[in-house]
C-alpha cells in the first residue's frame, strides 16, 4: 500500500505496478512520538504524518512539496529511515505549457524511482484501466474547504447535515479530465504530458498562482453551503 497526502499525486501511475494507493489521513490521539523529533509549531497534519510513519502505518509514502510543512515533514521522515520507499514530488505553481512539461518529467522520475525500488515493470494497460470515470450526475452538496479533512470527519458532516458532502481540501476533490481512451492513442512522451495536464487541470489549490478557476465553485448551483475547516 502506497500512501499519499496530496490530490496532485499521480496515484494511477502506481496501478501500473500493481499497487494500490490510499490517502494518509491518520487521526492520532496524541503527538507523543512526533513531538520528540519535530518542532512544536509544526502543523497538526504534518505531525500526524510523522506519527503514522513512526508507528509503522506508512512504509511507502509519496509526498508533494506543496507547503513548507510538507518539506519539513519529508526531511524528518527521511531521517527516521522508517519508510522503505519515500519520495518527494515537485509540484509546479502554474499550469502553463512549460510547467506541464516539467511536471510530466517529474512524474517520469517518480516512475523510474519506483521501478528501481520495486524491481517491477510498468504495465501501461493496468495504468489505463485505473482511471476513475468522471461523475456526470449532479445533485445538491455541501463543500468542505480549508485544511485537510479526514474521511471520519467527512462522514460525520454528511450524517449530521443529511446532504452529500464534497471534500474540496488538499486530499479531496480529485477529478482528472483526461481519459484512458485518449492516453492509449499516444506515445509515451505525449501520454505523460497529457497525464500531467490532467493532474494540473484540477480545481487549483492555494499553492497555485492562477487560482481564479476556484470561482467556479461558488457559481455551481448545486453548492448549497460551505464548511470551512
Q: What is the role of each PLM region?
A:
Residues 1-229:
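An N-terminal assembly and electron-transfer interface module characteristic of large anaerobic redox
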